[in-house]
């Protein structure tokens, strides 16, 4: 995977592949356990990738609006799932000879704002038809999708597509402040999207990888809207708790900020000015210095008892 992007070491110990020529840092994540043969859609695997992203953004000068997620074979399966679970983190998704399975089929609408470049071979065990459920939905709804199918080719890495990939990547950039978004989630760790965090999913929405699939489970739908004209953030969530994060590119901190949850206005302190402590904590935890949040609001929705309340009640019994 690393050499595919960067080329091999030359006698002087340098790599002069396409990534270096185009100004990219390439990170290869060791997310598999010993003897693991396939992607397992687990929290451990998500954390392996997201922790590396956080580590890199803290230690290097990274353009966080130009981060791409890619993988070959099982790594492509992982990239597809993690990309759709956290579409706000990436400028684009590049699954190669991969399968969109399990949660990808239920999270397909999360990719509305995520450019995807899918590469496969026509002789790779009907891979295009196996992914047709997801790909056809992307295409039908006008998502930013590129499919490169190589006729007469099978299960291989397709290094001859690399130059076209870099040309495609050069034209993509993440929009971290969309005016509207709608996503679905079924795992407790798929709980943050752009400027909204959620907590306590409805019981009939939670499906862990070991349980998948569960008949009757319905993904939790989260929709949000940024309305600068009236200095308002609006969300509709089925969860027990929601956290708004507010940055300087979103609203006017000199004016009162309005927060609406499920159609109801949330009472907020009069002082919604930037808070240095929140800013520093956000940069520390996310590592995104280009898109910092200056203020946040946490509120209960009343739909479900949060885990924190249950814990306090249990300790009091």
Q: Language-model segments: what does each one mean?
A:
Residues 7-9, 127-137, 245-248:
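Short alpha-helix in the alpha/beta-hydrolase fold that links the catalytic acid
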Residues 45-52, 75-82, 86, 130-134, ...:
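Stable alpha-helical elements in mature extracytoplasmic
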Residues 122-128, 155:
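Acidic catalytic loop of the alpha/beta-hydrolase fold
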Residues 140-146, 151-317:
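Alpha/beta-hydrolase-fold serine-hydrolase catalytic core, especially in secreted/extracellular enzymes
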């Amino acid at each position: 995977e690393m050499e595919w992007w960067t080329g091999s070491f030359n006698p002087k110990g340098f790599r002069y592949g396409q990534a270096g020529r185009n100004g990219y840092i390439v990170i290869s994540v060791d997310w598999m356990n010993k003897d693991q043969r396939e992607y397992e859609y687990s929290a451990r695997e998500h954390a392996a990738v997201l922790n590396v992203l956080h580590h890199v953004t803290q230690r290097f000068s990274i353009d966080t609006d130009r981060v791409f997620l890619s993988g070959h074979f099982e790594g492509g399966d992982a990239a597809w799932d993690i990309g759709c679970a956290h579409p706000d983190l990436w400028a684009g998704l590049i699954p190669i000879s991969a399968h969109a399975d399990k949660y990808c089929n239920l999270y397909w609408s999360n990719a509305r704002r995520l450019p995807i470049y899918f590469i496969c071979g026509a002789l790779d065990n009907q891979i295009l038809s196996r992914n047709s459920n997801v790909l056809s939905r992307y295409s039908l709804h006008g998502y930013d999708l590129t499919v490169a199918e190589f006729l007469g080719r099978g299960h291989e890495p397709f290094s001859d597509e690399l130059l076209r990939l870099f040309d495609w990547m050069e034209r993509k950039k993440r929009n971290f402040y969309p005016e509207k978004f709608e996503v679905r989630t079924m795992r407790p760790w798929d709980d943050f999207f752009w400027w909204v965090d959620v907590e306590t999913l409805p019981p009939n929405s939670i499906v862990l990888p070991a349980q998948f699939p569960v008949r009757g489970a319905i993904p939790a739908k989260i929709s949000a809207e940024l309305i600068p004209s009236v200095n308002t953030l609006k969300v509709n969530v089925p969860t027990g708790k929601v956290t708004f994060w507010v940055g300087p590119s979103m609203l006017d901190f000199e004016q009162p900020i309005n927060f609406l949850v499920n159609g109801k206005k949330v009472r907020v302190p009069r002082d919604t000015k930037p808070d240095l402590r929140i800013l520093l904590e956000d940069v520390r935890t996310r590592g995104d210095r280009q898109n910092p949040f200056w203020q946040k609001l946490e509120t209960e929705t009343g739909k479900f008892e949060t885990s924190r309340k249950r814990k306090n009640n249990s300790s009091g019994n």
